[in-house]
């Protein structure tokens, strides 16, 4: 009797498992958004204005600002990851892969401040820190409705211009400091 119940129970379990893989299962393929390469085809006026401010801040250092040619997406907090972005690159002769500056856009200045605080807090957590070298230096600046994010590390940034970019960006808008 117990053998029949066990056999019937096993058949019911198998039927449920197979039913879950059948018609009721989702056929949609889960995809992820592509990584950012340079600014979007249509960049807003706020992002263009922030780009102009960044270029002006870098000009005295004789560092040019270009559209990024390679995909780049740094570690981001959820609010920042969901925001529209444009990626630019400060041209560094000794570090052609470095100098990426990301400009995120938000609906208003308050939302940009909230996102800046969230990003700074995120970078202070284990989940945020593990995505960067131990000696990473972050620059987070709110400029109007945009948020500017730049990171560099002495251990991985061979160009002497890397810290100068951070210093130049520190002259823009309002800053946020991640906890150490």
Feature locations, PLM:
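C-terminal motif of bacterial Sec signal peptides marking the signal peptidase cleavage site
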Residues: 17-20
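Secretory pathway targeting signatures of secreted, lumenal, and periplasmic proteins
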Residues: 60, 65-99
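A short, solvent-exposed beta-edge/loop patch
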Residues: 28-41, 124-180
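Short, conserved charged micro-motifs
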Residues: 49, 110-114, 156-161
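Bacterial signal peptide processing site
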Residues: 22-25
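A short acidic-to-branched-hydrophobic micro-motif
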Residues: 94-114
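Bacterial N-terminal signal peptides that target proteins for export
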Residues: 1-10
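Amphipathic alpha-helical segments
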Residues: 49-64
């Amino acid at each position: 009797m117990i053998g029949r119940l066990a056999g019937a129970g096993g058949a019911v379990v198998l039927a449920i498992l197979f039913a879950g893989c059948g018609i009721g299962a989702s056929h949609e393929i889960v995809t992820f958004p592509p990584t950012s390469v340079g600014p979007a085809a249509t960049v807003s006026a706020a992002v263009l204005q922030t780009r102009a401010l960044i270029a002006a801040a870098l000009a005295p250092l004789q560092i040019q600002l270009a559209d990024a040619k390679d995909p780049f997406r740094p570690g981001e907090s959820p609010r920042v990851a969901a925001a529209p972005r444009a990626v630019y690159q400060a041209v560094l002769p000794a570090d052609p892969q470095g100098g990426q500056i990301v400009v995120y856009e938000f609906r208003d200045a308050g939302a940009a401040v909230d996102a800046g605080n969230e990003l700074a807090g995120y970078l202070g957590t284990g989940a945020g820190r593990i995505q960067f070298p131990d000696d990473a230096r972050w620059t987070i600046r709110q400029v109007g409705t945009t948020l500017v994010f730049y990171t560099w590390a002495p251990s991985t940034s061979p160009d002497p211009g890397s810290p100068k970019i951070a210093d130049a960006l520190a002259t823009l808008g309002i800053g946020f400091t991640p906890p150490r």
